[in-house]
């Protein structure tokens, strides 16, 4: 699997990224020479790395070059949460409306879909744990001590079902859930502070709202709304299927029918 991933990245570099990097290196040279203004530069990760001369590192000869690792990170970050979570949302909503048929009328309501997608994000993380190396000795509020250089992991699944925050039914999907002020409805799924996911707003909406009045809806709500407007429902003859030989919290197949397409 790792070899296949490396081959895919190599193909991406050869077909798209190398030419893009070469162009941005040249644009950076022209910008520094005063031939073009900053407004003439594209706004993307590659140009940002070129402008601060951070597109190559000393260890590039020993591993996948730094610049391609950054490109792969942003590509994965821009699509992984959406592609991982939406199947979970569809399955959860199907189960929910069977038990709460009155909510079927909300399937095209952006705010309701925002709540539903937030619940799925909370319950099904693409990356259950985030690892960091401690920069200094620190004592956590629990009293646990972490030494400088020690690796620690933020384990989101446990935090995301804490009864004190999400209620006694926190382990279950509930688009009607209310969370305390200051808490995100998706819990720790996207991280927090300096370690927050850079692509969160792309998925959840700019201001974390699902309605047009308060901000962009985000990719999850837009896709869900478009699908339900086309009469999307799970295929009764082909139920969702989990992957075999893996404990990863994902779906291998979620067949759907668009009744109004």
Task: For every predicted segment, state its role.
Residues 1-57:
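Cytochrome P450 catalytic core segment centered on helix I
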Residues 86-93, 117, 155, 207, ...:
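Buried hydrophobic packing segments
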Residues 177-254:
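Cytochrome P450 heme-thiolate "Cys pocket" and heme-binding signature region
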Residues 107-144:
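Conserved cytochrome P450 K-helix E-x-x-R motif and the immediately C-terminal K′/meander segment
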Residues 129, 149, 162-167, 200:
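Extended hydrophobic-aromatic, low-complexity segments
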Residues 155-182, 190:
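Conserved cytochrome P450 K-helix/beta-meander segment immediately N-terminal to the heme-binding cysteine loop
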Residues 13, 17, 47-105:
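Central I-helix of cytochrome P450 enzymes
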């Amino acid at each position: 699997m790792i070899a296949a991933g490396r081959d895919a990245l190599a193909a991406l570099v050869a077909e798209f990224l190398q030419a893009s990097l070469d162009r941005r290196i040249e644009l950076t040279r022209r910008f520094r020479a005063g031939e073009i203004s900053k407004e003439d530069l594209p706004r993307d990760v590659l140009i940002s790395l070129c402008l601060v001369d951070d597109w190559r590192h000393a260890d590039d000869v020993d591993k996948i070059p730094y610049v391609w690792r950054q490109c792969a990170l942003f590509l994965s970050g821009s699509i992984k949460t959406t592609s991982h979570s939406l199947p979970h949302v569809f399955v959860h909503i199907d189960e929910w409306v069977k038990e709460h048929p009155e909510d079927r009328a909300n399937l095209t309501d952006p705010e309701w879909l925002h709540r539903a997608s937030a619940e799925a994000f909370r319950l099904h993380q693409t990356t259950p744990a985030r690892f960091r190396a401690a920069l200094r000795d620190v004592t956590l509020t629990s009293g646990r001590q972490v030494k400088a250089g020690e690796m620690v992991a933020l384990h989101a699944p446990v935090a995301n079902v804490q009864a004190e925050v999400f209620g006694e039914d926190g382990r279950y999907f509930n688009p009607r859930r209310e969370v305390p002020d200051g808490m995100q409805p998706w819990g720790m799924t996207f991280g927090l502070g300096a370690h927050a996911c850079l692509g969160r707003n792309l998925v959840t909406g700019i201001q974390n709202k699902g309605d047009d009045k308060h901000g962009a809806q985000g990719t999850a709500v837009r896709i869900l709304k478009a699908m339900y407007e086309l009469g999307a429902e799970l295929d009764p003859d082909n139920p969702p299927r989990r992957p075999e030989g893996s404990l990863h919290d994902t779906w291998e197949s979620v067949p759907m029918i668009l009744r109004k397409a």
